[in-house]
Curated annotation (Swiss-Prot):
Membrane topology, record value: Multi-pass membrane protein
Matches recorded under InterPro entries: Mit_carrier, Mitochondrial_sb/sol_carrier, Mt_carrier_dom_sf
Source species, domain of life: Eukaryota
Name of the molecule in the record: Mitochondrial thiamine pyrophosphate carrier 1
Lineage per the UniProt record: Eukaryota, Fungi, Dikarya, Ascomycota, Pezizomycotina
Length: 318
């Protein structure tokens, strides 16, 4: 972490920020891939875990909790099942990280020039984070959709390769098929990244002096706290996004064969509440927090360290 808890907008050149963001996305995705697959499987599961009668006539596995789901995937699909969808996911995380941090830096720098009408620092961070998150999500959304569809595949493969999936969606669903659930994704990520960066920037100065933390840095701890608070608030929209991403001609071919037909964000939320109750909107929240906390910690720690290394490299080359 930069000395004194320096603001992210004041760190590095644009090129350094893009490279550090891409590296952070790459490392973060690899570390949390298994939890991401588990989260997606749980989010797509529609039957009640507390009502055994709802399991009747279910085609596909019945997952109960994070560890049992991991064991079930490994038993039925092998250890590689925990990394399904990793290629489009890695591409997405690299591009997302690069775009997000570059957009955040650019937006915060622009907002800082608004004197005498400048926003308070937390509001600046919220607006910049929301803008960066929305832009990065919209730009990389087709990869996000492909990641979800591959992770939702069971032992019977819906798509044989990344190329085959792109070709199939283009032929059978058209260009709009790559953006199913995009409105829910943007609606979720805008407040999420706004809250995340506002919380993170506020905690960085406080945690910069905590030298007893792992790796001697407070970046990871600040990322964990910010992520947990933000993720809990917007989780229902994340679940809706996943349900919408697997709509279309292949809806009944994924590991959960009984995924209902959903149309639109509002109608999807209403249908989930009507058939599964309010708890249905938070299915997979626990594993989502288990994933989001370390993912954010790894992302921010790797970003800060990569940026620090790139800055030192530039100084050494001068």
């Amino acid at each position: 972490m930069s000395a004194g808890g320096e603001h992210l907008k004041d760190e590095g050149t644009r090129r350094q920020v893009v490279l550090a963001g891409g590296i952070a996305g790459l490392v973060s995705r690899f570390c949390v891939a298994p939890l991401d697959v588990v989260k997606i499987r749980l989010q797509l599961q529609i039957h009640s875990l507390s009502d055994p009668t709802s399991h009747q006539n279910i085609k596909g596995p019945v997952y109960k909790g994070t560890l049992p789901t991991i064991r079930s995937i490994v038993r039925e699909e092998g250890i590689t099942g925990l990394w399904k969808g990793n290629i489009p996911a890695e591409l997405m995380y690299v591009c997302y990280g690069a775009i997000q941090f570059a957009a955040y830096r650019t937006t915060t720098q622009a907002l800082s020039q608004l004197d005498p009408y400048r926003l308070p620092p937390p509001a600046e961070s919220f607006v910049a984070g929301a803008t960066a998150g929305g832009l990065a999500t919209a730009s990389t959304y087709p990869l996000d959709l492909l990641r979800t569809r591959f992770a939702a595949q069971g032992t019977e493969r819906v798509y044989t390769s990344l190329y085959a999936s792109v070709r199939d969606i283009a032929q059978n669903e058209g260009p709009k098929g790559f953006f199913r659930g995009c409105s829910a994704a943007v609606g979720q990520i805008v407040p999420y990244m706004g809250l995340f960066f506002a919380t993170y920037e506020s905690l960085r100065p406080v945690m910069s002096g905590l030298h007893d933390l792992p790796f001697g840095s407070g970046d990871a701890a600040a990322g964990v706290v910010a992520s947990v608070l933000a993720k809990t608030g917007v989780f229902p929209l994340d679940l809706v996004r996943k349900r919408l991403q697997v709509q279309g001609p292949t809806r009944s071919k994924y590991v959960h064969r009984n995924i209902p037909e959903y149309q639109g964000v509002y109608n999807t939320m209403a249908m989930i509440v009507r058939t599964q109750g309010m708890r249905g909107l938070y299915r997979g929240l626990t594993v989502s927090l288990f994933k989001a906390a370390p993912a954010s910690a790894v992302t921010m720690w790797t970003y800060e360290k990569s940026l620090h290394y790139l800055r030192e490299l530039e100084v050494a080359s001068e």
